[in-house]
């Protein structure tokens, strides 16, 4: 395996050297000082700590001061701090492993660690055959082979220690879906033997899961009475060890909550039979994703429900009043700490809507609030405002969101199984929120889950719908300003208000406009930080001469992915598990400071696709199976990222729920599921944070690639949601031919779909810089090409992004450009 890995790395290096960028960032090495943004370590630790979820505890936690602890599992040293790929390839200035954190706690006199056991692990890891191998792109290890622990070794450790802590790790990532096999979704035989040996020798065993996604926990039932505590620590970034110890020792009371349902078996998940397809996946579960399915049709198949998480204290909930406003409901309630320790709680509000003719999930998250630390006995009152539109259902036949007649019951509590009724609201007759255009029509019929008689599960055929997309596009063609010749206007003049956008655009040739709709061509563009994700805007001498600076991009959700030492943040699932938007915003405000330091204008984050199935490799980047929680946490991240003048780029729009064959895979989904589940989080995020940019997904939706999808970009984003930011592709899109317009293909097809910017800019990974698309330029306003108006439309959106990002005080009399030409 090690020889194969070395050969693969060599091949990767040779390929990347020839690709002039390509995936060369994977090979980047950090250079420069080990810079740490002031306050970043504390922010990472706080976020990672609050995201830790306590699933089981018989009283062993928090560990008593001076407790004698034996730590098992190689992940105490070889911790998975983050998942793989563009969302995790960060070079942190430091990392704190659990082993290091336990050692520090011992030095401070808080714990006594089993030194003999630690030495056994260190000697085993030092052997060449047992050293961790990090693999290569798309072939990273999902686990590290565990050290066998014999009953005798466990007994020796138990003779010196009172409590065992077993750490088990898993990882997946971009181009690397989890697999339903041992070493990935399931435990290995060695790990099972480890648990058997340790639980047989110790009366108290704490199991810690270092994972970015849900794994099989059916074994927990078989260990009932033998496992004292179960902790989901996730990938906590560079402060993982410190965050874990702060919870285990009671420095903070655990307050994380699950963002996904943990089922009895993998096959219990409704998408399991329709995940992993090489050509397509039918979203047969429809709107019944995650808890929407389990709480409606299979509550008995749940090990740990959505929103669940224990604390070291207890809380009670008290309903207040429900008040109807013009377009919302206002619900008041109280939370009280009824235990003996201080702690935080997440108050979760769920709505149970009338079944009606459309069928509804038993419960849907309608709102939530994270309390501050409540002292024992302390009581706090809260108010949640629920927009009526947010609890409406989409009627596919009518093409509108509706509130069906009947009673809407609201429940407040600490999980989806909340018991306290917070109020009931009655709708006398059905209410509509207005007709919408049908989008992304199904092209091949398939069978979906629906609600039958008496609320029982039933099947229904999703029929093909015909939409005249050509007429829709032709009826909304942008009007061109036209080329009027040189006027000596710079972009700085526009930014300062001395000239208008149209005045500037009228000077630009078709070639200039085309350059504004594409990136430089490769990753690691020769502007800004080394190892950047690419550049757009002022990428040609002609545009730079007109005062258009280049805009620098970088991944990603877990920190800046450049050739420098940058902070490694907790993974998306960990952040969402905190259920604390203010905390997430504060963390990304620190990331925004780091963007300024390293000259990055656009952070390609957050990733916010739905956790449709636990095997998706990039679930660690994303937040939840629920769109409301996903949208709220993403909005907090965006507000933080944009706090210092930079841009967030939310992604991947939409239905990018699988890594296997992601560039070719077709997500076949009903319009109701698309709108209620897979677009809803983006809608919430855009409404609450106005992200400056959005990235399309690699996959198709009902036969149309997202980067060529007019309905996603124009009908929904621009038309329905009023989005004014920049729409860009993911890196390297697929060749495509418009079925509606003969001869319109590739970049012309994308521009006609109103996707503003192609990144990194070239179809060829051999590209080492910008090269004009002469075919597109030569066909402007001609058969088989786009109109000048369409080209201006996309270029205008790019220019607006450049002004926003590269000019200080863009309406000031003297707008000053930021330095975007320097290398850091």
Identify the meaning behind each predicted range.
Residues 1-393, 402-417, 433-824:
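Glycoside hydrolase catalytic-domain context in secreted enzymes
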Residues 399:
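Extracellular/periplasmic metallocenter environments
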Residues 419-423:
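Extracellular and select intracellular beta-sandwich modules with Ser/Thr-enriched
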Residues 424-434:
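Short beta-strand edge segments in extracellular beta-sheet folds
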């Amino acid at each position: 395996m090690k020889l194969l890995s070395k050969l693969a790395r060599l091949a990767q290096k040779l390929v990347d050297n020839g690709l002039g960028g390509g995936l060369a960032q994977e090979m980047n090495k950090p250079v420069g000082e080990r810079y740490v943004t002031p306050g970043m370590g504390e922010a990472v630790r706080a976020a990672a700590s609050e995201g830790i979820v306590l699933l089981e505890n018989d009283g062993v936690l928090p560990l008593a001061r001076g407790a004698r602890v034996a730590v098992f599992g190689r992940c105490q040293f070889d911790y998975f701090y983050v998942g793989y790929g563009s969302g995790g390839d960060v070079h942190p200035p430091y990392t704190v492993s659990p082993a290091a954190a336990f050692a520090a706690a011992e030095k401070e006199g808080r714990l006594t660690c089993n030194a003999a056991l630690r030495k056994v692990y260190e000697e085993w890891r030092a052997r060449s055959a047992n050293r961790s191998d990090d693999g290569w792109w798309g072939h990273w290890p999902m686990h590290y082979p565990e050290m066998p622990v014999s009953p005798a070794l466990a007994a020796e450790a138990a003779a010196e220690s009172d409590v065992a802590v077993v750490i088990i790790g898993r990882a997946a990532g971009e181009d690397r879906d989890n697999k339903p096999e041992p070493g990935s979704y399931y435990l290995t035989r060695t790990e099972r033997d480890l648990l058997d040996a340790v639980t047989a020798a110790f009366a108290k065993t704490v199991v810690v899961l270092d994972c970015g996604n849900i794994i099989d926990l059916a074994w927990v039932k078989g260990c009932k009475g033998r496992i004292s505590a179960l902790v989901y620590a996730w990938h906590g970034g560079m402060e993982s060890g410190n965050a874990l110890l702060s919870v285990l020792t009671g420095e903070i009371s655990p307050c994380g909550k699950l963002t996904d349902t943990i089922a009895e078996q993998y096959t219990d998940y409704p998408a399991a039979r329709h995940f992993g397809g090489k050509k397509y996946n039918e979203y047969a579960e429809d709107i019944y994703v995650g808890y929407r399915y389990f709480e409606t049709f299979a509550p008995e198949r749940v090990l740990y429900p959505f929103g669940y998480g224990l604390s070291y204290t207890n809380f009670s909930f008290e309903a207040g009043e429900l008040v109807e406003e013009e377009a919302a409901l206002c619900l008041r309630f109280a939370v009280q700490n009824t235990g003996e320790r201080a702690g935080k709680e997440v108050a979760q509000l769920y709505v149970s809507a009338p079944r009606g003719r459309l069928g509804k999930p038993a419960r849907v998250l309608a709102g939530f609030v994270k309390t501050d630390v409540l002292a024992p006995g302390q009581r706090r009152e809260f108010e949640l405002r629920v927009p009526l539109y947010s609890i409406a259902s989409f009627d596919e036949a009518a093409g509108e969101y509706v509130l069906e007649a009947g009673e809407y019951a609201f429940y407040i509590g600490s999980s989806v199984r909340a018991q306290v009724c917070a109020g009931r609201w009655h709708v006398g007759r059905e209410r509509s929120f207005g007709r919408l255009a049908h989008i992304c029509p199904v092209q091949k019929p398939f069978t979906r889950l629906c609600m039958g008689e008496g609320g029982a599960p039933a099947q229904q055929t999703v029929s093909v719908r015909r939409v005249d997309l050509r007429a829709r596009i032709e009826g909304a063609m942008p009007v061109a300003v036209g080329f009027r010749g040189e006027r000596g206007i710079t972009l700085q003049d526009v930014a300062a208000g001395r000239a208008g956008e149209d005045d500037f655009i009228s000077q630009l040739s078709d070639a200039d406009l085309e350059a504004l709709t594409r990136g430089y061509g490769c990753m690691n563009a020769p502007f800004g930080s080394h190892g950047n994700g690419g550049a757009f805007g002022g990428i040609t001498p002609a545009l730079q001469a007109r005062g258009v600076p280049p805009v620098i991009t970088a991944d990603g959700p877990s920190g800046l992915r450049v050739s420098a030492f940058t902070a490694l943040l907790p993974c998306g699932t960990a952040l969402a598990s905190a259920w604390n938007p203010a905390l997430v915003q504060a963390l990304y405000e620190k990331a925004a400071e780091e963007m300024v330091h390293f000259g990055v204008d656009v952070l390609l984050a957050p990733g916010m696709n739905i956790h449709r199935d636990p095997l998706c490799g990039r679930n660690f980047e994303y937040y939840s199976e629920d769109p409301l929680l996903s949208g709220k946490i993403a909005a907090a991240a965006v507000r933080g990222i944009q706090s210092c003048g930079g841009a967030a780029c939310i992604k991947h729009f939409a239905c990018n729920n699988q890594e296997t064959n992601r560039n070719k895979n077709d997500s076949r989904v009903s319009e109701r599921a698309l709108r209620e589940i897979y677009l809803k989080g983006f809608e919430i995020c855009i409404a609450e944070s106005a992200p400056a940019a959005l990235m399309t997904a690699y996959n198709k939706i009902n036969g149309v690639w997202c980067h060529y999808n007019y309905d996603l970009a124009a009908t929904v984003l621009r038309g329905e949601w009023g989005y004014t930011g920049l729409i860009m592709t993911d890196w390297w899109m697929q060749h495509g031919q418009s079925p509606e317009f003969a001869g319109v293909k590739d970049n012309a097809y994308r521009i006609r779909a109103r996707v503003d910017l192609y990144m990194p800019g070239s179809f060829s990974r051999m590209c080492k810089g910008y090269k004009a698309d002469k075919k597109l330029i030569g066909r402007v306003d001609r058969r088989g090409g786009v109109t000048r108006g369409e080209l201006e439309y996309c270029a205008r959106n790019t220019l607006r992004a450049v002004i926003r990002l590269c000019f200080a005080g863009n309406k000031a009399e003297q707008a000053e450009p930021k330095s975007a030409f320097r290398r850091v």
